[in-house]
Swiss-Prot record:
<keyword id="KW-0399">Innate immunity</keyword>
<dbReference type="GO" id="GO:0005615">
    <property type="term" value="C:extracellular space"/>
</dbReference>
<keyword id="KW-0929">Antimicrobial</keyword>
<dbReference type="GO" id="GO:0045087">
    <property type="term" value="P:innate immune response"/>
</dbReference>
<comment type="function">
    <text>Cecropins have lytic and antibacterial activity against several Gram-positive and Gram-negative bacteria.</text>
</comment>
<keyword id="KW-0732">Signal</keyword>
<dbReference type="GO" id="GO:0019731">
    <property type="term" value="P:antibacterial humoral response"/>
</dbReference>
<dbReference type="GO" id="GO:0050830">
    <property type="term" value="P:defense response to Gram-positive bacterium"/>
</dbReference>
<dbReference type="GO" id="GO:0050829">
    <property type="term" value="P:defense response to Gram-negative bacterium"/>
</dbReference>
<dbReference type="InterPro" id="IPR020400">
    <property type="entry name" value="Cecropin_insect"/>
</dbReference>
<comment type="similarity">
    <text>Belongs to the cecropin family.</text>
</comment>
<dbReference type="InterPro" id="IPR000875">
    <property type="entry name" value="Cecropin"/>
</dbReference>
<protein>
    <recommendedName>
        <fullName>Cecropin-C</fullName>
    </recommendedName>
</protein>
<keyword id="KW-0391">Immunity</keyword>
<keyword id="KW-0044">Antibiotic</keyword>
<keyword id="KW-0027">Amidation</keyword>
<keyword id="KW-0964">Secreted</keyword>
Length: 59
């Protein structure tokens, strides 16, 4: 019984103090993913017309 109470208090304290720092790290990670997605989308917009032109010439 006593162990459960100590575990619960420790869990609540960890959630209270560590929750804010994790949010910043997660946001920073998502910004990197968003930037990579934007680069892929831009490259696709530049490359797809070229690929369609080559397919039109070959096929």
């Amino acid at each position: 019984m006593n162990f459960k109470l100590i575990f619960l208090v420790a869990l609540v304290l960890m959630a209270a103090f560590l929750g804010q720092t994790e949010g910043r790290r997660f946001k920073k990670f998502l910004k990197k993913v968003e930037g990579a997605g934007r680069r892929v989308a831009n490259a696709a917009q530049k490359g797809l017309p070229l690929a369609a032109g080559v397919k039109g010439l070959v096929g």
